[in-house]
């Protein structure tokens, strides 16, 4: 069984590393805040100090961090993966970053003697905990096949989208749909509240028909309860939407829904909601309409 490394043990990375351990992989981890790694020690993981050390001890190395510059620093910065890379190392970036940056990083890695895949995920913290993630993979087919046993320990739906950067492009398409769905659910619930109809009955009916969506089923009950604890933070949602806007600008695309929902999330951030869950978008619509959609 191949040795697996994890760099980045946040909301997503920690449960993903735990699932790799439970699947029987030998796992080495590192994280900027070392205390995040300690729970994994009791489960059999080895904790080291730098990405360089993780690379030296791993055959498959997963990065799960916030941004393109973060991934670049982990791969090619001081004490980075590149300094510990060995022939056969496959670095798998499961963060959500720029498709353009991803292609550049793949070229640089190949020049340094190791290979990469981009494999961003959808499913949030619950999907990571339950090993039920959707994994969108970009890169060469031979390396996708090699990584498949690891992917199967982390997710239920694994799709090879295409070459380097394709996984990231697919993830950004997903994020556009997620954000606009959140807006649709928010507007529907506020509309129902303003017209004075039963909110729970309305939610159940819409969730049973053509207006249903993952957000209507999973987020609407929390919206109505005023539970905005993050499964996926607004700040991270906005980072992803900015990446999508940048890619759209590069291709001269007019995506008005994307632009609108990005501006509405900006308003939520400005009001101090950046660390709330992305379902908190309903609060912006409530302020615009002067109506609150909550169950008694």
Regions found by a protein language model. Give the residues of each.
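Rossmann-like NAD(P)(H) cofactor-binding subdomain of soluble oxidoreductases
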Residues: 51-56, 60, 68-133
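Active-site-proximal catalytic alpha-helix in oxidoreductases
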Residues: 130-138, 159, 163-195, 206-218, ...
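Hydrophobic beta-strand scaffold residues
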Residues: 27, 47, 116-117, 158, ...
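NAD(P)+-binding Rossmann beta1-loop-alpha1 motif at the extreme N-terminus of oxidoreductases
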Residues: 1-63, 89, 94, 125
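Rossmann-fold dinucleotide-binding core
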Residues: 4, 97-175, 179
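Interdomain hinge/lid region at the active-site interface
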Residues: 164, 168, 212-280, 296
């Amino acid at each position: 069984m191949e040795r697996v490394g994890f760099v980045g043990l946040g909301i997503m990375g920690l449960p993903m590393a735990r699932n790799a351990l439970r699947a029987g992989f030998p796992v080495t981890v590192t994280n900027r805040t070392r205390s995040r790694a300690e729970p994994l020690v009791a489960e059999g993981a080895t904790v080291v100090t730098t990405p360089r050390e993780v690379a030296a001890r791993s055959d498959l190395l997963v990065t799960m961090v916030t941004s393109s510059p973060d991934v670049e620093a982990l791969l090619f910065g001081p004490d980075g993966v590149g300094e510990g890379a060995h022939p056969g190392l496959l670095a798998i970036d499961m963060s959500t970053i720029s498709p353009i940056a991803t292609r550049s990083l793949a070229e640089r890695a190949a020049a340094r003697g190791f290979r990469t895949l981009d494999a961003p995920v959808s499913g949030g913290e619950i999907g990571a905990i339950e090993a039920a993630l959707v994994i969108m993979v970009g890169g060469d087919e031979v390396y996708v096949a090699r990584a498949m046993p690891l992917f199967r320990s982390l997710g239920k739906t694994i799709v090879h989208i295409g070459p380097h950067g394709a996984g990231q492009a697919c993830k950004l398409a997903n994020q556009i749909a997620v954000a606009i769905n959140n807006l649709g659910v928010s507007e529907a619930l506020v509309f129902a509240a303003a017209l004075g109809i039963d909110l729970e009955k309305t939610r159940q009916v819409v969730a049973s028909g053509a207006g249903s969506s993952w957000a209507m089923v999973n987020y609407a009950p929390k919206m109505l309860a005023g539970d905005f604890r993050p499964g996926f933070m607004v700040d991270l949602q906005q980072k992803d939407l900015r990446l999508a806007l940048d890619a759209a600008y590069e291709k001269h695309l007019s995506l008005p829904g994307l632009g609108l929902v990005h501006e509405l999330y900006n308003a939520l951030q400005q009001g101090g909601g950046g660390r709330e869950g992305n379902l908190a978008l309903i609060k912006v619509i409530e302020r615009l309409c002067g109506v609150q959609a909550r169950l008694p």
